[in-house]
Amino acid sequence: MASPLDFGIADNELTSYVTPDCQSIIPISRTASLRSSVQWGDIPIPVSIFHSTYKVNSSAYIGELPYATETEIERNTKRYACAVTALFSVAGRLYLNGKPLITATSMFGQLPDWNEYISIWSATNTTTAYIKNGIEYGSTKSNDLGPGFVSYCNNKGYNLQESHAGAPIFEQFKQQIANNCNSIFTAQAISNGSTVGHSMAVAGWVDATRTPGNDPAVGHSYLYVYDGWNGMSYIDYNYPVFTYTFVTFFSG
């Protein structure tokens, strides 16, 4: 598994490959400097930790996302890009004529449509950032993510629209979830002096407070996402080390 420091983003339009450390830890304090360095793998909060540490005040979900793990993707496609992985998951949630547009998970004994991963890679103009141990790790320009995926879906007979913008507000995600629509959240953070980004498919939102004994006891906004590596997680939407955020909303 590659280090999250192997490749850094060159500008605000690139989403690089990053991967977490093997161990998950409690997120750093919200009082951290806005430009503190952090490992991207430390940012997602595992579901088990979240529900044992936070009290949910309000929430809404579109349901669980079908997903393939990074290990599965690398083994079967010899590629990995976080934006493509997020879109692959979204494609598995779209239905055409009563059937999923693609199979995006191996859960329940299913066989993912790995060729579709490559097709989404091509449609979004994802480029190879580097090759390690025979695996191509890719980067996707944020502005190509939505239009490329719309083109991919339209070519398969599914009518999809998209919109995208930098610095989205949390209320926009709440409206998307209320409309049962898909979103991709992209964020950048400083990691050992380099700007490293990551894209994740969104499945819900949560307003939560830390449980007694876990300060601060104020409500915060979280997104429920497929972390792009191993499973569903929560992301603090106002995480102090994010230097840039970007959203792609889909409808249809």
Language-model segments: which ranges?
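Active-site-adjacent structural segments surrounding the nucleophilic cysteine of cysteine proteases
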Residues: M1-G138
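Active-site signature of cysteine proteases
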Residues: A2-F7, I169-E171, A178-N179, T186-G252
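Generic detector of intrinsically disordered, low-complexity, polar/charged segments
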Residues: L5, V38, A60, Y95, ...
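Ser/Thr- (and often Asn-) enriched beta-sheet segments in non-cytosolic proteins
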Residues: P27, P44, N159-Q161, Y224
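Predominantly the structural core of cysteine protease catalytic domains
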Residues: F88-S89, S122-A208
